[in-house]
């Protein structure tokens, strides 16, 4: 290669040497000029680069760069501003739409306000018109009632509410005999609250007491001791005459009339005295019910009326005292005749109402029937003038509760005529409760029990559909209970069969005795194949089951042959208890079988463990005896809930308990308290169950 190169170089040199003489001097000048121009251009380039570098490092250049950046940013800001303006214009349009909608709503609300005011004015006008119309109708009704000779308050009380006062769980009749005296309506002064003062300190004669309405206080059974005011016809009002204005302490119309009758009437003392005593009892009970707080509230509510009429109150008290001194026997005979006549009319109205409502009694509720019947009888007894005895009525709530308790507890019923007489003696009041007592006895008695109808109950045949309905319901319940009994029997058979198969599979090498497989319908145990000692065991179980059935309270119906009722006479609840007793018998028999099986298993397990661990130390024997004792204790616990007869028989028979010598006799454990606690008791181990599977 060097030679080549050298050779090459020598060739070029030869060419240049050969061509050098051919070049002219102008060529060299041209080359020199070009080289000089190249140097000058390079020099200028370097100068320009230096200037550019210096310019870039100067503040002016930086300012220009910043200005360019700011101009670019300004352009971006202007663009975003333009977009924001467009968006704001859209928002303004939307706001304008919302504003127009709100203005439309405000106009609508103004219209609604106008309509509201118009409607309120219309409602007020209608209320005033309704009040005026009600006042006119009340006045017309009162005038008609006065013309007919019947008090308007009593006429309203017959149709609107029940005139009864419930106090301390007792219902007392509050119908006043003022309904028989027709007087003029002179004033109608409503008051917010009123108090009841001494009934013997404000007696008036028939000439001065212009009473036009009876004061009947009604309270609910739920709030009989918590009411704050006395309600009269749904409102708190009291009607008195001009001579007896309303004050903070005013007498009810009923009390004034009855005090008048008690003080002045001697010829008709029987009827009027009984009514006066009822009124006295009513007001004494009301005085007890009205607590001091209620009295204070009444005084506060009526303070304005008392302050305005204080002078009138003083004059009224003086006037009453003067009339009290001059009170004499001035009651006319016409009052008694009108009283008897109105009582007969009232009784006739009640009988007609009873006949009209008798068709609905068969389809109504039993409680409503009893309440209506009791209410009618109380009103009839209160309005009649022939009775001279003071009778205290029993409240409807108490009667309903007693009847429900008697219906829901068939085990406490009395059979035959003795039970009927006892119930009649518990509910009797000579004439007042005879029909109701017979109705309750008919409802509570068995459907097929033979009883002669009472001559005092002409409406008794109307209640026969209830007996038929109860009979059909009893048959349905009986069929349902029989189906449940059959299901329980089949399930128990299945369970006993499975357990017997399981036990026989485990102890097939040690036992040849067959378990019972069939349960008889008479709640006893019937052996499929009696073998050896199983016969005596099952006989004992049957005796125990029958003894349990005789002793248990739920099976008293099946065990009492002297009641004189057939199986069809049983009510549904008694049928259910009968089937429940059968299921309990089967359960007790099953427990006895389980007890005998577990005891035999414990015996076999003990023998097997003793044979296997006879050569081991005390630990093995302890384990063996504890296992056997656990099984035995389970058996005794399962049989501890048996009948009392089985326990007594086990106490009478000689008992052989199973004890492990390794645990009780040869054990080194000195803890005697634990041994005493774990030691099985003698009366829990019957002697004839220990070799159940032995052949």
UniProtKB/Swiss-Prot annotation:
Skewed-composition ranges (Basic and acidic residues): 299-313, 360-377, 448-465, 676-686
Location(s), subcellular:
Cytoplasm, Cytoskeleton, Microtubule organizing center, Centrosome; Cytoplasm, Cytoskeleton, Cilium basal body
Mind telling me how this protein is modified after translation? Phosphorylation at Thr-391 by PLK1 is not needed for centrosomal localization or pericentriolar material expansion but is indispensable for spindle-pole stabilization.
> What ranges does the record list as Low complexity composition bias?
15-24, 382-391, 633-645
> Where is the stretch described as Disordered?
1-24, 261-313, 351-391, 444-465, 633-695
Segments passing through the bilayer: none
Record-listed Phosphothreonine modification sites: 391
Q: Which GO terms describe its molecular function?
A: protein kinase binding
Superkingdom as given in the UniProt entry: Eukaryota
What's any GO biological process attached to this entry? Answer: spindle organization
Tell me the subunit arrangement. Interacts with AKAP9, CEP72, ODF2, PCNT and TUBGCP2.
Name of the protein in its database record: Centrosomal protein kizuna
Q: Which organism is it from?
A: Mus musculus
């Amino acid at each position: 290669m060097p030679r080549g190169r050298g050779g090459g170089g020598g060739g070029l040199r030869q060419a240049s040497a050969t061509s050098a003489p051919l070049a002219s001097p102008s060529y060299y000048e041209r080359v020199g000029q070009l080289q000089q121009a190249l140097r000058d251009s390079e020099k200028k380039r370097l100068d320009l680069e230096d200037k550019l570098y210096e310019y870039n490092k100067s503040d002016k250049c930086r300012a220009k760069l910043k200005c360019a950046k700011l101009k670019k940013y300004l352009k971006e800001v202007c663009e975003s501003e333009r977009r924001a303006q467009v968006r704001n214009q859209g928002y303004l349009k939307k706001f304008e739409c919302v504003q127009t909608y709100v203005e439309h709503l405000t106009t609508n609300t103004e219209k609604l306000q106008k309509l509201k005011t118009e409607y309120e004015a219309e409602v007020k006008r209608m209320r005033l018109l309704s009040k005026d119309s009600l006042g006119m109708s009340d006045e017309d009704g009162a005038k008609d009632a006065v013309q007919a000779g019947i008090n308007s308050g009593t006429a309203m009380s017959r149709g609107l509410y029940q005139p009864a006062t419930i106090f301390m769980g007792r219902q007392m009749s509050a119908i006043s005999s003022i309904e028989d005296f027709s007087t003029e309506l002179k004033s109608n002064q409503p008051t917010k609250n009123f108090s009841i003062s001494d009934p013997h300190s404000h007696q008036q004669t028939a000439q001065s007491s212009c009473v036009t309405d009876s004061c009947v206080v009604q309270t609910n059974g739920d709030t009989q001791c918590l009411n704050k005011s006395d309600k009269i016809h749904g409102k708190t009002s009291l009607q008195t005459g001009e001579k007896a204005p309303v004050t903070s302490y005013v007498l009810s119309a009923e009390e004034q009339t009855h005090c008048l009758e008690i003080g002045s009437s001697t010829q008709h003392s029987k009827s009027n005295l009984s009514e006066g005593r009822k009124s006295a009892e009513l007001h004494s009970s009301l005085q007890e019910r009205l607590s001091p707080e209620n009295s204070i509230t009444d005084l506060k509510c009526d303070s304005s009326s008392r302050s305005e009429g204080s002078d009138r109150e003083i004059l009224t008290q003086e006037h009453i005292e003067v009339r009290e001194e001059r009170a004499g026997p001035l009651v006319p005979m016409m009052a008694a005749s009108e009283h008897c006549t109105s009582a007969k009319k009232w009784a006739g109205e009640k009988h007609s109402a009873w006949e009209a409502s008798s068709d609905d009694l068969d389809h109504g509720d039993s409680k409503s029937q009893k309440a209506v019947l009791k209410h009618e009888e109380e009103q009839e007894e209160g309005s009649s003038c022939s009775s001279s005895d003071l009778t205290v009525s029993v409240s409807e709530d108490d009667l309903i509760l007693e009847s429900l308790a008697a219906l829901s507890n068939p085990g406490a019923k009395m059979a035959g005529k003795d039970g009927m007489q006892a119930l009649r003696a518990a509910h009797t009041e000579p004439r007042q409760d005879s029909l109701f007592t017979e109705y309750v006895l008919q409802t509570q008695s068995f459907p097929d029990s033979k009883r002669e109808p009472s001559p005092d109950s002409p409406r008794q045949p109307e209640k026969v559909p209830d007996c038929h309905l109860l009979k059909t319901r009893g048959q349905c319940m009986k069929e349902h209970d029989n189906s449940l009994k059959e299901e329980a029997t089949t399930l128990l058979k299945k369970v006993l069969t499975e357990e017997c198969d399981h036990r026989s599979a485990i102890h097939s090498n040690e036992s040849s005795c067959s378990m019972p497989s069939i349960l008889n319908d008479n709640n006893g145990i019937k052996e499929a194949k009696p073998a050896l000692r199983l016969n005596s065991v099952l006989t004992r179980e049957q005796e125990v089951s029958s003894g349990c059935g005789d002793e248990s309270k739920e099976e008293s119906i099946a065990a009492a042959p002297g009641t004189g009722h057939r199986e069809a006479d049983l009510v549904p609840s008694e049928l259910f208890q009968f089937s429940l007793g059968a299921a309990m018998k089967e359960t007790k028999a099953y427990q006895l079988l389980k007890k005998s099986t577990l005891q035999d298993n414990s015996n076999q397990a003990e023998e097997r463990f003793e044979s296997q661990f006879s050569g081991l130390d005390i630990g093995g024997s302890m384990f063996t005896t504890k296992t056997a004792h656990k099984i035995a204790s389970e058996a005794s616990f399962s049989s501890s809930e048996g009948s009392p007869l089985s326990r007594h028989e086990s106490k009478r028979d000689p008992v052989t308990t199973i004890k492990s010598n390794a645990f009780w006799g040869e054990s080194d454990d000195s803890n005697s308290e634990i041994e005493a606690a774990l030691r099985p008791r003698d009366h829990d181990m019957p002697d004839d169950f220990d070799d159940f599977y032995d052949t």
